[in-house]
Amino acid sequence: MIIKNLQEFYRLLIPNTQLIAIDYGSKKLGIAMSNGERSIAMPLNTITVVNKTAVINSVLSIIAKYKICGVVIGLPIDMSGVVTQQTNIVMKFAEELAKYTNLPIYLQDERLTTKAANNFLKSFGVKRKDRNNNDDAVAASMILETVLDSIKRY
């Protein structure tokens, strides 16, 4: 189920369980995961987009393997706040995922996270090819970190 309010999303989470975040792209998805205490977010992996079914199955496999209790999906909104074609694609992905899991799904504004992730990796001297292979998972961890920081208030 897609939850629009962060406090409601938090209320639906099972204590001491992990969350995942997804940075959805047309070619690959970055996946990040929290620890059980939800104090840190870590890049987990990158999934290559083959087709919609394969992507959904990969995400569901991660959910089952790590006993995930909630999903955060980065929502790409234009810098001016305008909904874009990619915004609609991500919303459709979230709706599709919601058909296969009862977990709460929260859409988090992800403006500039992939660029920030790429700059972060670059600052550590990571080569361009390696940055491009890992920036989506790092971006997902930044998206998740934003949510983790926000839910600490509740």
UniProtKB/Swiss-Prot annotation:
A GO MF label: nuclease activity
UniProt-listed Enzyme Commission number(s): 3.1.-.-
Any Pfam family the entry gives: RuvX
Superkingdom per UniProt: Bacteria
InterPro entries: RNaseH-like_sf, YqgF, YqgF/RNaseH-like_dom, YqgF/RNaseH-like_dom_sf
Family matches, as SMART domains: YqgFc
Chief place of localization: cytoplasm
Keyword annotations from UniProtKB, A to Z: Cytoplasm, Hydrolase, Nuclease, Ribosome biogenesis
Cellular compartments per GO CC: cytosol
GO biological process terms, semicolon-separated: rRNA 5'-end processing
Subcellular location(s) of the protein: Cytoplasm
Presence of keyword Cytoplasm: yes
Transmembrane segments: none
Family to which this protein belongs: Belongs to the YqgF nuclease family.
Known role: Could be a nuclease involved in processing of the 5'-end of pre-16S rRNA.
Protein known as: Putative pre-16S rRNA nuclease
Organism: Rickettsia canadensis (strain McKiel)
